């Protein structure tokens, strides 16, 4: 794992975006096209803002959505489809973007997306880490073993409180209890993982990811077993590392 510690969130976002864009260009040069995964949440603001500015032939890129709440409208402020359309998809010209639809039958949606992603080996996965150490919406204890590319998952209280704290919902009761998430194994199949984790509120999760045991209780700790992961931190998120 390559660990890069920046002085600020903006510097972190720029470095992560430049690194990721270079890997996308390499995939296009080698294969004629690239397949990527894109994450959401407050931790990805700076990275995505810089990524759309990079010199990439986006018309050769197919992108996949990491996760989505079950049961909220695409127009809801917390919808990850809305987030990605506004911050990423509408700013570039992708070959294709495969959204997770949380308003349809969730198990059928998992099967639909699983069939598509199985035909698109992922070159670069842009991900983050939650305050509870989750990877995508795989909250602890995460399922490290399932081969299913997408899962219906239950969101734990700490995860739901993080979403409330970031301002996506008006009350804790408004935060959905379930979501569709890409599985840990599917994320780990990615050729390269770019993990962007700013902010002091992520410091405990970063410490657990890097210094504890690799465990389903700290889902992101499994990134240490991936051959090519870049972990981008800032001074605050790295402040508890020894």
Where are these regions (language model features)?
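Class I SAM-dependent methyltransferase SAM-binding "motif I" and its flanking Rossmann-like core
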Residues: 136-182
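Glycine-rich N-terminal segment of FAD-binding domains in flavoprotein oxidoreductases
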Residues: 25-54
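Glycine-rich phosphate-binding loop
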Residues: 120-145
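N-terminal glycine-/serine-/threonine-rich phosphate-binding loop
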Residues: 1-36, 107
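ATP/nucleoside-binding phosphotransfer catalytic cores, i.e., glycine-rich phosphate-binding loops
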Residues: 182-185, 189-242
């Amino acid at each position: 794992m390559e660990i890069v510690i920046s002085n600020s969130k903006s510097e972190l976002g720029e470095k992560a975006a430049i690194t990721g864009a270079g890997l996308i260009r390499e995939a296009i040069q080698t294969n004629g096209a690239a397949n990527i995964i894109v994450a959401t949440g407050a931790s990805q603001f700076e990275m995505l803002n810089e990524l759309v500015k990079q010199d990439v032939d986006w018309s050769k890129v197919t992108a996949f959505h990491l996760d989505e709440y079950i049961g909220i409208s695409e127009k809801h402020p917390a919808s990850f489809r809305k987030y990605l359309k506004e911050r990423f998809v509408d700013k570039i010209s992708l070959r294709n973007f495969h959204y997770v639809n949380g308003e349809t039958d969730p198990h059928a949606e998992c099967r639909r997306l699983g069939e598509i992603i199985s035909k698109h080996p992922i070159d670069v996965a842009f991900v983050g880490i939650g305050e509870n150490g989750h990877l995508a919406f795989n909250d602890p204890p995460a399922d490290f073993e399932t081969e299913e590319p997408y899962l219906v998952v239950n969101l734990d209280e700490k995860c739901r409180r993080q979403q409330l704290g970031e301002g996506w919902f008006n009350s804790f009761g408004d935060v959905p209890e379930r979501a569709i998430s890409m599985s840990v194994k599917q994320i780990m199949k990615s050729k390269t993982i770019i993990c962007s984790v700013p902010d002091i509120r992520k410091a405990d999760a970063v410490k657990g990811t890097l210094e504890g045991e690799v465990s389903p209780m700290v889902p992101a700790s499994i990134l240490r077993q991936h051959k090519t992961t870049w972990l981008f931190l800032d001074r605050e998120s790295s402040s508890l590392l020894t």
